[in-house]
Structure formats: structure tokens, C-alpha cells
Amino acid sequence: LPERQPPRHLAIQINQALHDLLCKYPSSLLFGEDVAQKGGVYTVSKGLLKAFGPRRVFNTLLDETMILGMAQGLANLGMLPIPEIQYLAYLHNAADQLRGEACSLQFFSNDQYRNPMLVRIAGLGYQKGFGGHFHNDNSITALRDIPGLVVGCASRGDDAAMMLRTLAALAQVDGRVAVFLEPIALYMTKDLHAAGDGQWLFPYPAPDQALVLGEGRVYAAEASDLVIFTYGNGVPMSLRAARTIEAELGWQVRVVDLRWLVPLNAGFIAEQGADAQRVLVVDEGRHSAGVGEGVITALVEAGLGHLPLQRVCGADTYTPLAGAAMCVLPSDNAVTSAARVLAQDH
């Protein structure tokens, strides 16, 4: 059983969680580009075709509009589709299938009709050796204002497994359209601070464990000198930066992994900011219309606009090729530099 295995990385635990979901929900189907025989570009769906057969795990055409359109049709027939969009940038070809069709059906039919689905999307930045905009898209803005949509993003394996269970239950029970955003650069990550430390490997959670919708993960909850809000690749980045900040400035640093990006849990954000001396928002998305804007808005609307605050985020541009990508994305050094600015000003 996976819960009896040693701690594992993100990709393996997503694979194990998908296996569990296909066992739990007999009506579930997993499909997308290269998900079957190949097991996905990053082997995340490896072995699922052999375990469940071609009627439940199958490849599709290279057409995201068709993939999401087929998911709606299958959902209307009583199935639980788990479609994969191979890369986040590819979603934009088919965004209206979510915005104008899938997410609006319950609303416009007064809940007479539902088309539940759990959409897996591999994305975000920092992927090395294979990239450019179409494989390292860091923007989820197109998903942020779709009514009824739920978007989760896990940065570590155990959270991923529990989040998938929650999203699948939301789809199956409430008929929700859910998106599970998978940070490609963290798929195989095992270490946090130094090579070989194994600090980004985690035990697989027992089958009865799931996440509470909207609840983030808090590291060093008692610390309040600086509170960092982040998600995805920003979580290990902020944890590494926190160690440097603590050594250099003598601050105790709390890191808050939002986990749930749509809708943002404003109450949770306000709760974490209430005792903060300073706030730093680390958002790998773009400067305009990114998740960070929502975090800051939640703090201001909770009456916390007086707090000293800095934001580290991606530039308003496309992700370039090779090492140039690092010039437009947040980094460990950018996070520590923002903390130094807060120290100078406050």
C-alpha cells in the first residue's frame, strides 16, 4: 500500500492518488494527450492504463477544446471525467469550455443539470531544460474570475493526494467543476535546502485523509515578525528564503501556503495576517491580475492595510527560453531582498 511506503515526491503521490480515485469512483475516466501508453509527459499517469484498461484511461486528440467538451458530455451522461490539459498555456485555447459552458450549467439550469469534472493541468514556471512560454506559463488569471470554479494547487505530495480527494468529492457530490494545478518543476523535487536532504519527500496520506476546502498549510505558525503568503513553487522558495532571513535579520518567519487559489479564502488570509508585523506576498504569477492581488485585497478589506507590505511576483511578460526565464520569475534572492526592504523601511 502506498501509505506504507517511504516518503515520496509529488509526481509519484499524484499517480498513487489517481489510482485510488479510479478505484473509489467506478464512473471515473482519465483521459488527455499521451496519458495512456506513455503515462503522460512526466509519467504522472504511468501504469493506470494497465491497471484500469483502455475504456477508463485513454488518449485524446491534441485538441484542448475537444478534451474539455468531451468531459462535459461524459459528465452529463453520469460519468466523473478526469481530463488532463497537458500544459497550462494550452488551456487558453479552450478556456470558454470552462468559463461559458461547464461552470455555468448548474447556474443557468437552477441545478437541474450538472457536469462535474476534475481537470488536471500541469503548469507554472521553473521547469529546466524544456520550456519557453508554452511549457512554463505562470499565469492562472484566466481561471480566477470564473463563478463556481474551484482551483487548488499543491506544492508537496501529501497535500496533492489529499487535495485530489477533496476535489473529486466536490465534483461527485456537489457537481462542481474543479481544477487541480500541478507545478511541473516540483514533480520530481526531493530536497529543500541542500542536495540529498530529502526534506521535500512526504509520506502518502491514509485513504481517509482529505483537505478542507479553503484551508492552507502554515509553516512556523507561532512566528509573526514576517508572514509570507505564497503557493506552488513559491512554497519551497519561501521556506529557503525564510532560513536566510531568520539568520540575517533575526526575524521569526511564518510561511503560509494558500493551497486553494480559487476562490481565495479571505477569512483564512485575514486570520494569518492579523498578528503579523510585516507581510510579504510571493506570487510566481504575473504582476497584473495575479493571485497576489487577491491576497493583498483580502488583507486590506480585513482592516490590515496598515501593515508594512512587499510583493514579489513575475513580470508582465511571456516566459522566455532557457536561463532567461529566471529573469522574469521570483527567486530566493528576490524574496530575501524584499525582506531587507521591509527591514530598512520599518
Predicted regions and their residues:
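Thiamine diphosphate
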Residues: L1-V177, L181, A185-Y187, A194, ...
